């Protein structure tokens, strides 16, 4: 199972890619695998403010609905609107096409609380 080393990870199975104080966030391959076929993705509005741990949307699969949690605090600067029409991207390409939101980071000290790829792999038993 892919756990790209260039990303950070949350214990709630979100991946985080940091570029110039903006965090791109999606769910991991492990998470989409556990959920099964994704049929609907609900995401927030641009400019919404999030605190670490806030719910920012949900992913609905044929099995269940799973909440999405903000791995860091900040303002949403972009939302992947393609997922509204193509939720299957979450299954097909969780680390590329299926990014969910981009968050302008308000407290970069929170990044230290995220897991490395090795720590995340250990957590999921890989």
Curated annotation (Swiss-Prot):
Coiled-coil residue spans: none
A single BP term in Gene Ontology: glycine decarboxylation via glycine cleavage system
Gene Ontology cellular-component terms listed: cytosol; glycine cleavage complex
Entries under PROSITE patterns matching the protein: BIOTINYL_LIPOYL, LIPOYL
Entry keyword set: Lipoyl
Residues recorded as bearing N6-lipoyllysine in the entry: 63
Origin: domain of life: Bacteria
Domain Lipoyl-binding, chain residue ranges per copy: 22-104
Record Pfam families: GCV_H (PF01597)
Signal peptide: none
UniProt cross-references to Gene3D superfamilies, sorted A to Z: 2.40.50.100
InterPro entries: 2-oxoA_DH_lipoyl-BS (IPR003016), Biotin_lipoyl (IPR000089), GCV_H (IPR002930), GCV_H/Fam206 (IPR033753), GCV_H_sub (IPR017453), Single_hybrid_motif (IPR011053)
Stated role: The glycine cleavage system catalyzes the degradation of glycine. The H protein shuttles the methylamine group of glycine from the P protein to the T protein. Is also involved in protein lipoylation via its role as an octanoyl/lipoyl carrier protein intermediate.
Protein family (similarity comment): Belongs to the GcvH family.
Subunit structure: The glycine cleavage system is composed of four proteins: P, T, L and H.
Protein name: Glycine cleavage system H protein
Species the sequence originates in: Staphylococcus epidermidis (strain ATCC 12228 / FDA PCI 1200)
Name of the gene: gcvH
């Amino acid at each position: 199972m892919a756990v790209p080393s260039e990303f950070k990870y949350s214990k709630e199975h979100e991946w985080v890619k940091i570029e110039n104080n903006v965090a791109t966030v999606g769910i991991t391959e492990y998470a989409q695998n556990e959920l099964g076929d994704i049929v609907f993705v609900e995401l927030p509005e641009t400019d919404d403010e999030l605190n670490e741990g806030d719910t920012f949307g949900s992913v609905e699969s044929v099995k269940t609905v799973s909440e999405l949690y903000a791995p860091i605090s900040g303002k949403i600067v972009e939302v992947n609107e393609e997922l509204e029409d193509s939720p299957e991207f979450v299954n097909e390409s969780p680390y590329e096409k299926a990014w969910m939101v981009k968050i302008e980071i308000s407290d970069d000290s929170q990044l230290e609380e995220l897991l490395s790829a090795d720590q995340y792999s250990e957590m999921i038993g890989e």
